[in-house]
């Protein structure tokens, strides 16, 4: 199986109409969309997703933010998709994100940074299992041989 990552467009990204732009950037890179959900997140689910941050002082505000509106949860697949996906997204703090990255182009405040992306293969697997217990769609693009050797 090729490497997969979990990407979530946060409520601010949805409200600002950035869903198509964000999906386009991953598709143009050559990654495959293998799962997509447009959902309103329940508090308990958000707390489970961000459980590793539960001791941080910003945890409560982060959970409130994630449940404030719908999110787009996605599985993306491709060679080095976790590392490359993080580069496409940019630094967690938009002030440190390069122009050309999603956060560098569309975010200003760390508390409204548009998008979440798995930081490692292990966390991607955990997040995908949480958000997509049914698994990813089973398909391969007809463009595969034009993108990968």
From Swiss-Prot:
Top-level taxon of origin: Eukaryota
The entry's keywords: ATP-binding, Kinase, Magnesium, Metal-binding, Nucleotide metabolism, Nucleotide-binding, Phosphoprotein, Phytochrome signaling pathway, Transferase
GO molecular function: ATP binding; metal ion binding; nucleoside diphosphate kinase activity
Keyword Transferase: yes
Residues annotated as signal peptide: none
Catalytic residues (UniProt): 116
Record-listed ATP binding positions: 10, 58, 86, 92, 103, 113
SUPFAM superfamilies: Nucleoside diphosphate kinase, NDK
Enzyme class per UniProt: transferase
Annotated catalysed reactions: a 2'-deoxyribonucleoside 5'-diphosphate + ATP = a 2'-deoxyribonucleoside 5'-triphosphate + ADP; a ribonucleoside 5'-diphosphate + ATP = a ribonucleoside 5'-triphosphate + ADP
Cofactor(s) listed in the protein's UniProt record: Mg(2+)
A Pfam family annotated for this UniProt entry: NDK
GO biological process, one term: CTP biosynthetic process
Keyword Kinase: yes
Family statement drawn from the similarity comment of this UniProt entry: Belongs to the NDK family.
HAMAP family according to UniProt: NDP_kinase
PANTHER family: NUCLEOSIDE DIPHOSPHATE KINASE
UniProt function note: Major role in the synthesis of nucleoside triphosphates other than ATP. The ATP gamma phosphate is transferred to the NDP beta phosphate via a ping-pong mechanism, using a phosphorylated active-site intermediate. This NDK is microtubule-associated.
Protein name stated in the entry: Nucleoside diphosphate kinase 1
Annotated organism of origin: Pisum sativum (Garden pea)
Lineage: Eukaryota, Viridiplantae, Streptophyta, Embryophyta, Tracheophyta
